[in-house]
Curated annotation (Swiss-Prot):
Its EC number(s): 7.1.2.2
Gene symbol of the encoding locus: atpB
Keywords: ATP synthesis, ATP-binding, CF(1), Chloroplast, Hydrogen ion transport, Ion transport, Membrane, Nucleotide-binding, Plastid, Thylakoid, Translocase, Transport
NCBIfam families for the chain: atpD (TIGR01039)
GO biological process: proton motive force-driven mitochondrial ATP synthesis
Name this protein carries in UniProt: ATP synthase subunit beta, chloroplastic
InterPro entries in UniProt: AAA+_ATPase, ATP-synt_VA_C, ATP_synth_F1_bsu, ATPase_a/bsu_AS, ATPase_alpha/beta_chains, ATPase_F1/V1/A1_a/bsu_N, ATPase_F1/V1/A1_a/bsu_N_sf, ATPase_F1/V1/A1_a/bsu_nucl-bd
Matches recorded under HAMAP family: ATP_synth_beta_bact (MF_01347)
Protein family (similarity comment): Belongs to the ATPase alpha/beta chains family.
Length: 498
Protein backbone atom coordinates (compact mmCIF):
# COMPACT_ATOMS: atom_id res chain seq x y z
CA UNK A 1 0.00 0.00 0.00
CA UNK A 2 1.51 3.25 -1.13
CA UNK A 3 1.55 5.98 1.49
CA UNK A 4 1.18 9.45 0.03
CA UNK A 5 1.36 12.92 1.55
CA UNK A 6 -2.12 13.86 2.66
CA UNK A 7 -3.73 16.42 0.40
CA UNK A 8 -6.20 18.03 2.75
CA UNK A 9 -6.32 19.46 6.23
CA UNK A 10 -3.21 20.31 8.26
CA UNK A 11 -0.90 18.12 6.16
CA UNK A 12 -0.85 20.67 3.34
CA UNK A 13 1.29 23.10 5.34
CA UNK A 14 4.13 20.55 5.34
CA UNK A 15 4.17 20.30 1.52
CA UNK A 16 7.17 21.74 -0.23
CA UNK A 17 6.07 24.79 -2.15
CA UNK A 18 8.48 24.06 -5.01
CA UNK A 19 5.65 23.64 -7.52
CA UNK A 20 3.20 26.48 -7.24
CA UNK A 21 1.14 28.25 -9.85
CA UNK A 22 -1.50 30.97 -10.11
CA UNK A 23 -5.20 30.85 -10.95
CA UNK A 24 -5.70 32.22 -14.49
CA UNK A 25 -9.44 31.61 -14.91
CA UNK A 26 -12.43 30.37 -12.89
CA UNK A 27 -15.56 28.99 -14.58
CA UNK A 28 -17.83 27.57 -11.86
CA UNK A 29 -16.12 24.48 -10.41
CA UNK A 30 -13.38 24.50 -13.09
CA UNK A 31 -10.07 26.34 -12.60
CA UNK A 32 -7.35 27.11 -15.14
CA UNK A 33 -3.96 27.35 -13.42
CA UNK A 34 -0.69 28.67 -14.89
CA UNK A 35 2.56 27.04 -13.72
CA UNK A 36 6.19 28.03 -14.41
CA UNK A 37 7.81 26.19 -17.38
CA UNK A 38 9.03 22.71 -16.39
CA UNK A 39 6.92 22.66 -13.21
CA UNK A 40 3.70 21.26 -14.71
CA UNK A 41 1.68 18.83 -12.54
CA UNK A 42 0.62 15.40 -13.81
CA UNK A 43 -2.96 14.45 -14.73
CA UNK A 44 -4.96 13.52 -11.55
CA UNK A 45 -2.52 15.37 -9.25
CA UNK A 46 -4.22 17.17 -6.37
CA UNK A 47 -3.82 20.95 -6.29
CA UNK A 48 -4.53 23.00 -3.17
CA UNK A 49 -5.62 26.64 -3.01
CA UNK A 50 -5.18 28.21 0.42
CA UNK A 51 -5.68 31.82 1.38
CA UNK A 52 -8.34 34.33 2.37
CA UNK A 53 -11.20 35.80 0.36
CA UNK A 54 -12.03 39.51 0.17
CA UNK A 55 -14.11 39.22 3.36
CA UNK A 56 -11.20 37.70 5.31
CA UNK A 57 -12.71 34.19 5.39
CA UNK A 58 -10.22 31.32 5.18
CA UNK A 59 -10.23 29.33 1.92
CA UNK A 60 -9.00 25.75 1.50
CA UNK A 61 -10.02 24.23 -1.84
CA UNK A 62 -8.62 20.99 -3.27
CA UNK A 63 -8.78 20.42 -7.04
CA UNK A 64 -7.81 17.59 -9.37
CA UNK A 65 -5.91 18.14 -12.63
CA UNK A 66 -7.97 16.94 -15.61
CA UNK A 67 -6.32 18.49 -18.67
CA UNK A 68 -2.95 19.92 -19.72
CA UNK A 69 -3.89 22.79 -22.04
CA UNK A 70 -0.48 23.89 -23.32
CA UNK A 71 1.21 27.27 -22.70
CA UNK A 72 1.99 26.06 -19.14
CA UNK A 73 -1.72 25.93 -18.22
CA UNK A 74 -3.68 23.09 -16.66
CA UNK A 75 -7.43 22.71 -16.15
CA UNK A 76 -8.55 21.34 -12.79
CA UNK A 77 -11.91 20.45 -11.25
CA UNK A 78 -12.63 21.63 -7.69
CA UNK A 79 -13.79 19.15 -5.03
CA UNK A 80 -15.62 21.83 -3.05
CA UNK A 81 -17.27 25.20 -3.72
CA UNK A 82 -15.06 27.78 -5.48
CA UNK A 83 -16.74 30.75 -3.73
CA UNK A 84 -14.20 33.41 -2.78
CA UNK A 85 -11.46 32.29 -5.18
CA UNK A 86 -9.94 35.03 -7.33
CA UNK A 87 -7.58 35.16 -10.29
CA UNK A 88 -3.93 35.34 -9.28
CA UNK A 89 -4.32 33.26 -6.08
CA UNK A 90 -1.48 30.83 -5.38
CA UNK A 91 -2.08 27.14 -6.16
CA UNK A 92 0.18 24.42 -4.71
CA UNK A 93 0.81 21.13 -6.56
CA UNK A 94 0.88 18.32 -3.97
CA UNK A 95 2.78 16.09 -6.42
CA UNK A 96 0.40 13.14 -5.88
CA UNK A 97 -3.23 12.12 -6.51
CA UNK A 98 -5.89 12.68 -3.85
CA UNK A 99 -5.20 10.34 -0.93
CA UNK A 100 -7.64 9.25 1.76
CA UNK A 101 -7.33 7.53 5.16
CA UNK A 102 -7.78 3.74 5.06
CA UNK A 103 -7.92 0.89 7.57
CA UNK A 104 -9.60 0.39 10.93
CA UNK A 105 -9.54 4.13 11.72
CA UNK A 106 -12.26 4.70 9.09
CA UNK A 107 -14.86 2.41 10.72
CA UNK A 108 -17.84 4.13 12.31
CA UNK A 109 -16.97 7.49 10.74
CA UNK A 110 -18.45 9.66 7.95
CA UNK A 111 -16.06 11.09 5.35
CA UNK A 112 -16.27 13.46 2.41
CA UNK A 113 -14.55 12.91 -0.94
CA UNK A 114 -11.19 14.14 0.44
CA UNK A 115 -11.25 11.65 3.31
CA UNK A 116 -11.94 14.39 5.87
CA UNK A 117 -14.32 13.38 8.70
CA UNK A 118 -17.62 15.32 8.61
CA UNK A 119 -19.30 13.78 11.69
CA UNK A 120 -17.71 16.16 14.26
CA UNK A 121 -16.21 13.25 16.21
CA UNK A 122 -12.66 14.58 16.08
CA UNK A 123 -9.72 13.88 13.75
CA UNK A 124 -9.00 10.51 12.12
CA UNK A 125 -5.64 8.71 12.23
CA UNK A 126 -4.16 9.49 8.80
CA UNK A 127 -0.86 7.63 9.08
CA UNK A 128 -2.07 5.10 6.51
CA UNK A 129 -3.45 6.71 3.38
CA UNK A 130 -3.99 5.45 -0.13
CA UNK A 131 -4.39 7.22 -3.50
CA UNK A 132 -7.90 7.08 -4.96
CA UNK A 133 -6.57 6.36 -8.48
CA UNK A 134 -5.20 2.82 -8.73
CA UNK A 135 -5.13 0.13 -11.39
CA UNK A 136 -7.42 -2.92 -11.21
CA UNK A 137 -5.96 -6.21 -9.84
CA UNK A 138 -4.01 -8.33 -12.34
CA UNK A 139 -5.69 -11.42 -13.88
CA UNK A 140 -3.46 -13.76 -11.88
CA UNK A 141 -4.73 -12.27 -8.58
CA UNK A 142 -8.43 -12.79 -9.37
CA UNK A 143 -10.57 -15.42 -7.67
CA UNK A 144 -13.35 -17.18 -9.58
CA UNK A 145 -15.15 -19.25 -6.91
CA UNK A 146 -18.96 -19.31 -7.28
CA UNK A 147 -21.11 -19.22 -4.16
CA UNK A 148 -24.50 -17.74 -3.25
CA UNK A 149 -24.82 -14.69 -1.01
CA UNK A 150 -28.02 -15.12 1.03
CA UNK A 151 -29.89 -11.87 1.69
CA UNK A 152 -33.02 -13.06 3.54
CA UNK A 153 -35.22 -11.34 0.90
CA UNK A 154 -37.42 -14.00 -0.76
CA UNK A 155 -37.73 -12.57 -4.26
CA UNK A 156 -33.96 -11.97 -4.51
CA UNK A 157 -32.79 -15.30 -3.09
CA UNK A 158 -35.21 -17.37 -5.17
CA UNK A 159 -35.28 -15.69 -8.59
CA UNK A 160 -32.11 -13.58 -8.96
CA UNK A 161 -29.61 -14.77 -6.31
CA UNK A 162 -26.54 -12.68 -5.56
CA UNK A 163 -22.99 -13.93 -5.98
CA UNK A 164 -20.50 -13.67 -3.11
CA UNK A 165 -17.80 -11.34 -4.40
CA UNK A 166 -20.00 -10.26 -7.32
CA UNK A 167 -21.52 -7.02 -8.56
CA UNK A 168 -25.24 -6.47 -8.17
CA UNK A 169 -27.33 -3.64 -9.62
CA UNK A 170 -30.65 -2.37 -8.24
CA UNK A 171 -32.42 -0.70 -11.16
CA UNK A 172 -35.43 1.55 -10.77
CA UNK A 173 -36.90 4.97 -11.48
CA UNK A 174 -37.54 7.66 -8.88
CA UNK A 175 -39.40 6.58 -5.73
CA UNK A 176 -39.76 2.82 -6.30
CA UNK A 177 -37.63 1.78 -3.31
CA UNK A 178 -33.95 1.42 -4.32
CA UNK A 179 -32.57 3.12 -1.20
CA UNK A 180 -34.97 1.23 1.12
CA UNK A 181 -33.84 -2.06 -0.45
CA UNK A 182 -30.17 -1.09 -0.01
CA UNK A 183 -30.83 -0.15 3.63
CA UNK A 184 -32.57 -3.50 4.22
CA UNK A 185 -29.64 -5.36 2.63
CA UNK A 186 -27.20 -3.45 4.87
CA UNK A 187 -29.33 -4.31 7.89
CA UNK A 188 -29.66 -8.04 7.02
CA UNK A 189 -26.11 -8.57 5.84
CA UNK A 190 -24.38 -6.52 8.55
CA UNK A 191 -26.14 -8.69 11.16
CA UNK A 192 -25.60 -12.05 9.44
CA UNK A 193 -22.23 -11.34 7.78
CA UNK A 194 -19.37 -10.64 10.16
CA UNK A 195 -17.20 -8.57 7.80
CA UNK A 196 -16.98 -4.84 7.27
CA UNK A 197 -18.99 -2.67 4.89
CA UNK A 198 -18.26 0.60 3.12
CA UNK A 199 -21.18 2.78 2.03
CA UNK A 200 -20.65 5.34 -0.74
CA UNK A 201 -23.44 7.93 -0.93
CA UNK A 202 -22.96 9.37 -4.42
CA UNK A 203 -25.15 12.36 -5.28
CA UNK A 204 -28.21 11.26 -3.33
CA UNK A 205 -30.39 13.02 -0.72
CA UNK A 206 -28.58 14.26 2.41
CA UNK A 207 -31.67 13.36 4.48
CA UNK A 208 -31.37 9.69 3.42
CA UNK A 209 -27.68 9.73 4.35
CA UNK A 210 -28.58 11.06 7.80
CA UNK A 211 -31.40 8.49 8.21
CA UNK A 212 -28.98 5.68 7.31
CA UNK A 213 -26.42 6.92 9.85
CA UNK A 214 -29.05 7.11 12.63
CA UNK A 215 -30.36 3.68 11.74
CA UNK A 216 -26.89 2.16 11.83
CA UNK A 217 -26.31 3.63 15.28
CA UNK A 218 -29.62 2.19 16.51
CA UNK A 219 -28.94 -1.27 15.09
CA UNK A 220 -25.38 -1.37 16.50
CA UNK A 221 -23.64 -1.51 13.09
CA UNK A 222 -22.01 1.73 14.26
CA UNK A 223 -20.99 1.40 17.91
CA UNK A 224 -21.16 4.85 19.53
CA UNK A 225 -19.57 3.70 22.79
CA UNK A 226 -16.58 2.12 21.05
CA UNK A 227 -16.24 3.45 17.49
CA UNK A 228 -13.45 0.95 16.69
CA UNK A 229 -15.98 -1.91 17.09
CA UNK A 230 -18.13 -0.51 14.26
CA UNK A 231 -18.68 -2.53 11.09
CA UNK A 232 -19.08 0.22 8.48
CA UNK A 233 -17.36 3.29 7.03
CA UNK A 234 -19.55 5.93 5.36
CA UNK A 235 -18.42 8.21 2.52
CA UNK A 236 -20.85 10.91 1.40
CA UNK A 237 -20.80 13.25 -1.59
CA UNK A 238 -24.43 14.29 -1.73
CA UNK A 239 -26.64 16.17 -4.21
CA UNK A 240 -25.50 19.62 -3.05
CA UNK A 241 -21.80 18.91 -3.73
CA UNK A 242 -20.02 20.20 -6.87
CA UNK A 243 -19.72 17.68 -9.76
CA UNK A 244 -16.02 17.02 -9.05
CA UNK A 245 -16.83 15.68 -5.58
CA UNK A 246 -19.75 13.55 -6.82
CA UNK A 247 -17.56 12.11 -9.58
CA UNK A 248 -14.77 11.07 -7.19
CA UNK A 249 -16.63 10.05 -4.01
CA UNK A 250 -17.25 6.55 -5.42
CA UNK A 251 -13.49 6.11 -5.83
CA UNK A 252 -12.90 7.28 -2.24
CA UNK A 253 -15.31 4.60 -0.91
CA UNK A 254 -13.79 1.96 -3.20
CA UNK A 255 -10.24 2.81 -2.04
CA UNK A 256 -11.28 2.22 1.60
CA UNK A 257 -12.89 -1.11 0.63
CA UNK A 258 -9.79 -2.20 -1.35
CA UNK A 259 -7.59 -1.73 1.72
CA UNK A 260 -9.78 -4.08 3.80
CA UNK A 261 -9.62 -6.63 0.95
CA UNK A 262 -5.92 -6.39 0.02
CA UNK A 263 -4.19 -5.62 3.31
CA UNK A 264 -6.59 -6.93 5.99
CA UNK A 265 -7.60 -9.87 3.71
CA UNK A 266 -11.29 -9.45 4.58
CA UNK A 267 -14.53 -10.00 2.68
CA UNK A 268 -15.97 -6.53 2.22
CA UNK A 269 -19.39 -5.22 1.21
CA UNK A 270 -19.41 -2.06 -0.89
CA UNK A 271 -22.73 -0.24 -1.23
CA UNK A 272 -22.99 2.55 -3.80
CA UNK A 273 -26.11 4.71 -3.86
CA UNK A 274 -26.33 5.85 -6.66
CA UNK A 275 -24.02 4.80 -9.51
CA UNK A 276 -26.08 6.86 -12.00
CA UNK A 277 -25.07 10.04 -10.12
CA UNK A 278 -21.41 9.07 -10.72
CA UNK A 279 -22.16 9.03 -14.48
CA UNK A 280 -24.19 12.24 -14.21
CA UNK A 281 -21.35 14.06 -12.41
CA UNK A 282 -18.90 12.77 -15.06
CA UNK A 283 -21.21 14.18 -17.73
CA UNK A 284 -21.24 17.60 -16.01
CA UNK A 285 -17.45 17.63 -15.66
CA UNK A 286 -17.03 16.53 -19.29
CA UNK A 287 -19.19 19.45 -20.47
CA UNK A 288 -17.29 21.89 -18.23
CA UNK A 289 -14.02 20.65 -19.74
CA UNK A 290 -15.38 21.37 -23.21
CA UNK A 291 -15.60 17.80 -24.53
CA UNK A 292 -18.05 17.01 -27.33
CA UNK A 293 -21.06 15.16 -25.82
CA UNK A 294 -21.98 11.65 -26.94
CA UNK A 295 -25.40 9.89 -27.09
CA UNK A 296 -28.18 11.59 -25.04
CA UNK A 297 -25.68 14.25 -23.93
CA UNK A 298 -23.48 11.86 -21.91
CA UNK A 299 -19.70 12.14 -21.86
CA UNK A 300 -17.81 10.42 -24.72
CA UNK A 301 -15.69 8.62 -22.09
CA UNK A 302 -18.72 7.01 -20.36
CA UNK A 303 -17.61 3.37 -20.88
CA UNK A 304 -14.01 4.11 -19.86
CA UNK A 305 -15.00 5.90 -16.64
CA UNK A 306 -17.48 3.18 -15.69
CA UNK A 307 -14.93 0.44 -16.50
CA UNK A 308 -12.14 2.03 -14.44
CA UNK A 309 -14.44 2.05 -11.37
CA UNK A 310 -16.12 -1.34 -11.90
CA UNK A 311 -12.97 -3.33 -12.74
CA UNK A 312 -11.48 -2.45 -9.34
CA UNK A 313 -14.56 -3.92 -7.61
CA UNK A 314 -13.60 -7.58 -7.73
CA UNK A 315 -12.56 -10.63 -5.71
CA UNK A 316 -8.91 -11.56 -5.37
CA UNK A 317 -7.19 -14.49 -3.66
CA UNK A 318 -6.70 -12.20 -0.62
CA UNK A 319 -10.37 -11.31 -0.09
CA UNK A 320 -13.54 -10.24 -1.84
CA UNK A 321 -15.57 -7.09 -2.47
CA UNK A 322 -19.27 -7.80 -2.95
CA UNK A 323 -20.77 -4.67 -4.42
CA UNK A 324 -24.44 -3.67 -4.35
CA UNK A 325 -25.16 -0.61 -6.47
CA UNK A 326 -28.38 1.33 -6.84
CA UNK A 327 -28.90 2.48 -10.43
CA UNK A 328 -31.40 5.27 -11.09
CA UNK A 329 -33.13 4.70 -14.44
CA UNK A 330 -34.00 8.05 -16.08
CA UNK A 331 -37.68 8.11 -17.11
CA UNK A 332 -37.84 4.33 -16.44
CA UNK A 333 -35.91 3.76 -19.71
CA UNK A 334 -33.52 0.81 -19.32
CA UNK A 335 -31.99 1.55 -22.76
CA UNK A 336 -30.62 4.92 -21.57
CA UNK A 337 -26.78 4.85 -21.99
CA UNK A 338 -26.11 5.16 -18.21
CA UNK A 339 -28.03 2.04 -17.02
CA UNK A 340 -27.19 0.21 -20.28
CA UNK A 341 -23.43 0.69 -19.68
CA UNK A 342 -23.82 -0.45 -16.06
CA UNK A 343 -25.63 -3.68 -17.10
CA UNK A 344 -22.48 -4.99 -18.80
CA UNK A 345 -20.55 -5.14 -15.52
CA UNK A 346 -23.09 -6.92 -13.30
CA UNK A 347 -23.52 -10.53 -12.13
CA UNK A 348 -27.11 -9.97 -11.01
CA UNK A 349 -29.72 -7.31 -11.72
CA UNK A 350 -32.65 -6.55 -9.45
CA UNK A 351 -35.15 -4.49 -11.47
CA UNK A 352 -37.75 -2.53 -9.50
CA UNK A 353 -41.14 -2.03 -11.15
CA UNK A 354 -43.39 1.01 -10.80
CA UNK A 355 -46.40 -1.20 -11.60
CA UNK A 356 -45.73 -3.45 -8.58
CA UNK A 357 -45.06 -0.43 -6.35
CA UNK A 358 -48.44 1.00 -7.45
CA UNK A 359 -50.10 -2.29 -6.39
CA UNK A 360 -48.48 -1.92 -2.96
CA UNK A 361 -46.22 -4.97 -3.41
CA UNK A 362 -42.92 -4.22 -1.67
CA UNK A 363 -40.09 -4.86 -2.38
CA UNK A 364 -41.32 -3.93 -5.88
CA UNK A 365 -38.85 -6.32 -7.56
CA UNK A 366 -39.94 -7.39 -11.05
CA UNK A 367 -39.57 -11.21 -10.95
CA UNK A 368 -39.46 -11.55 -14.77
CA UNK A 369 -37.07 -8.66 -15.52
CA UNK A 370 -34.52 -9.42 -12.77
CA UNK A 371 -31.65 -11.70 -13.79
CA UNK A 372 -28.69 -13.51 -12.25
CA UNK A 373 -25.78 -15.47 -13.67
CA UNK A 374 -25.99 -17.65 -10.52
CA UNK A 375 -29.39 -19.20 -11.33
CA UNK A 376 -27.96 -22.42 -12.79
CA UNK A 377 -28.63 -25.96 -11.48
CA UNK A 378 -24.90 -26.69 -10.98
CA UNK A 379 -24.58 -23.65 -8.66
CA UNK A 380 -27.91 -23.42 -6.79
CA UNK A 381 -28.99 -27.08 -7.04
CA UNK A 382 -31.86 -28.71 -8.95
CA UNK A 383 -34.60 -28.06 -6.36
CA UNK A 384 -33.95 -24.30 -6.22
CA UNK A 385 -33.56 -24.01 -10.01
CA UNK A 386 -36.74 -25.94 -10.82
CA UNK A 387 -38.81 -24.01 -8.24
CA UNK A 388 -37.55 -20.68 -9.61
CA UNK A 389 -38.30 -21.70 -13.21
CA UNK A 390 -41.84 -22.88 -12.32
CA UNK A 391 -42.52 -19.61 -10.45
CA UNK A 392 -41.35 -17.63 -13.50
CA UNK A 393 -43.45 -19.78 -15.88
CA UNK A 394 -46.57 -19.26 -13.75
CA UNK A 395 -46.02 -15.48 -13.58
CA UNK A 396 -45.26 -15.30 -17.32
CA UNK A 397 -48.49 -17.19 -18.16
CA UNK A 398 -50.45 -14.81 -15.89
CA UNK A 399 -48.89 -11.84 -17.71
CA UNK A 400 -49.93 -13.31 -21.09
CA UNK A 401 -53.51 -13.86 -19.86
CA UNK A 402 -53.95 -10.34 -18.47
CA UNK A 403 -55.17 -8.88 -21.80
CA UNK A 404 -57.84 -11.58 -22.10
CA UNK A 405 -58.89 -11.05 -18.46
CA UNK A 406 -59.18 -7.26 -18.90
CA UNK A 407 -61.35 -7.63 -22.04
CA UNK A 408 -63.43 -10.76 -21.38
CA UNK A 409 -63.07 -11.40 -17.64
CA UNK A 410 -61.88 -14.45 -15.68
CA UNK A 411 -64.96 -16.52 -16.55
CA UNK A 412 -63.87 -16.91 -20.18
CA UNK A 413 -60.63 -18.70 -19.18
CA UNK A 414 -60.22 -22.48 -19.13
CA UNK A 415 -60.23 -24.24 -15.73
CA UNK A 416 -56.45 -24.76 -15.97
CA UNK A 417 -55.78 -21.10 -16.77
CA UNK A 418 -58.01 -19.94 -13.91
CA UNK A 419 -55.97 -22.10 -11.54
CA UNK A 420 -52.73 -20.64 -12.97
CA UNK A 421 -54.03 -17.08 -12.43
CA UNK A 422 -55.07 -17.84 -8.83
CA UNK A 423 -51.63 -19.33 -8.03
CA UNK A 424 -49.79 -16.51 -9.82
CA UNK A 425 -51.66 -13.91 -7.75
CA UNK A 426 -50.71 -15.78 -4.56
CA UNK A 427 -47.06 -15.99 -5.72
CA UNK A 428 -47.05 -12.26 -6.57
CA UNK A 429 -48.24 -11.42 -3.06
CA UNK A 430 -45.95 -13.95 -1.38
CA UNK A 431 -42.97 -12.28 -3.10
CA UNK A 432 -43.71 -9.22 -0.93
CA UNK A 433 -42.14 -9.09 2.51
CA UNK A 434 -42.10 -6.73 5.53
CA UNK A 435 -38.73 -4.97 5.93
CA UNK A 436 -36.92 -4.20 9.19
CA UNK A 437 -36.05 -0.69 7.95
CA UNK A 438 -39.67 0.00 6.89
CA UNK A 439 -41.32 -1.01 10.21
CA UNK A 440 -42.25 2.63 10.88
CA UNK A 441 -44.19 2.79 7.58
CA UNK A 442 -45.80 -0.68 7.46
CA UNK A 443 -46.43 -1.20 11.17
CA UNK A 444 -45.43 -4.87 10.83
CA UNK A 445 -42.11 -6.25 12.12
CA UNK A 446 -39.41 -7.08 9.54
CA UNK A 447 -38.76 -10.68 8.49
CA UNK A 448 -35.54 -12.44 7.41
CA UNK A 449 -36.44 -15.59 5.45
CA UNK A 450 -33.80 -18.29 4.90
CA UNK A 451 -33.36 -19.76 1.41
CA UNK A 452 -34.58 -23.28 2.33
CA UNK A 453 -37.76 -21.82 3.87
CA UNK A 454 -38.32 -19.64 0.77
CA UNK A 455 -38.06 -22.65 -1.59
CA UNK A 456 -40.41 -24.71 0.62
CA UNK A 457 -43.04 -21.92 0.59
CA UNK A 458 -43.12 -21.52 -3.19
CA UNK A 459 -43.16 -25.30 -3.74
CA UNK A 460 -46.28 -25.53 -1.55
CA UNK A 461 -48.07 -22.80 -3.56
CA UNK A 462 -47.11 -24.42 -6.89
CA UNK A 463 -48.20 -27.89 -5.71
CA UNK A 464 -51.77 -26.65 -5.16
CA UNK A 465 -51.86 -27.52 -1.44
CA UNK A 466 -52.74 -23.92 -0.57
CA UNK A 467 -55.29 -23.27 -3.36
CA UNK A 468 -58.06 -22.89 -0.77
CA UNK A 469 -56.42 -19.96 1.07
CA UNK A 470 -57.37 -16.34 0.25
CA UNK A 471 -54.86 -14.17 -1.68
CA UNK A 472 -54.53 -11.54 1.05
CA UNK A 473 -53.13 -14.17 3.45
CA UNK A 474 -49.91 -14.18 1.38
CA UNK A 475 -49.44 -10.40 1.38
CA UNK A 476 -46.57 -8.94 3.46
CA UNK A 477 -45.68 -12.10 5.39
CA UNK A 478 -42.34 -13.84 5.92
CA UNK A 479 -42.58 -17.65 5.79
CA UNK A 480 -45.40 -19.81 4.37
CA UNK A 481 -46.39 -20.83 7.93
CA UNK A 482 -47.17 -17.16 8.65
CA UNK A 483 -49.38 -17.09 5.53
CA UNK A 484 -51.40 -20.13 6.71
CA UNK A 485 -51.73 -18.59 10.20
CA UNK A 486 -52.88 -15.29 8.63
CA UNK A 487 -55.46 -17.21 6.54
CA UNK A 488 -56.84 -18.85 9.71
CA UNK A 489 -57.11 -15.41 11.37
CA UNK A 490 -58.91 -13.96 8.33
CA UNK A 491 -61.36 -16.88 8.40
CA UNK A 492 -62.05 -16.34 12.12
CA UNK A 493 -62.64 -12.62 11.53
CA UNK A 494 -65.09 -13.28 8.69
CA UNK A 495 -66.93 -15.87 10.87
CA UNK A 496 -67.23 -13.32 13.68
CA UNK A 497 -68.66 -10.71 11.28
CA UNK A 498 -71.33 -13.17 10.21
Amino acid sequence: MRINPTTSGPGVSTLEKKKSGRIAQIIGPVLDVTFPPGKMPNIYNALVVKGRDTGGQEINVTCEVQQLLGNNRVRAVAMSATDGLTRGMEVIDTGAPLSVPVGGATLGRIFNVLGEPVDELGPVDTRTTSPIHRSAPAFIQLDTKLSIFETGIKVVDLLAPYRRGGKIGLFGGAGVGKTVLIMELINNIAKAHGGVSVFGGVGERTREGNDLYMEMKESGVINEQNIAESKVALVYGQMNEPPGARMRVGLTALTMAEYFRDVNKQNVLLFIDNIFRFVQAGSEVSALLGRMPSAVGYQPTLSTEMGSLQERITSTKAGSITSIQAVYVPADDLTDPAPATTFAHLDATTVLSRGLAAKGIYPAVDPLDSTSTMLQPRIVGDEHYETAQRVKETLQRYKELQDIISILGLDELSEEDRLTVARARKIERFLSQPFFVAEVFTGSPGKYVGLAETIRGFKLILSGELDGLPEQAFYLVGTIDEATAKAANLEMESDLKK
